[in-house]
């Protein structure tokens, strides 16, 4: 499970939480695009990636 700080960041700004774990990898870019198109899909993806 992701650390508390990563998940907390992901709730408010999803790409930041993913960036803290994966850097500028594919997960970050997918999360950024999802968040730009609609916040909720980006949030769901960020929580999923951080807790898998």
Swiss-Prot record:
Spans traversing the lipid bilayer: 4-24, 30-50
A GO cellular-component term linked to this record: membrane
Topological category with respect to the lipid bilayer: Multi-pass membrane protein
Annotated InterPro entries: PMP3
Record flagged with keyword Cytoplasm: no
Compartments, record wording: Membrane
Keywords for this protein: Membrane, Transmembrane, Transmembrane helix
Protein name: UPF0057 membrane protein At1g57550
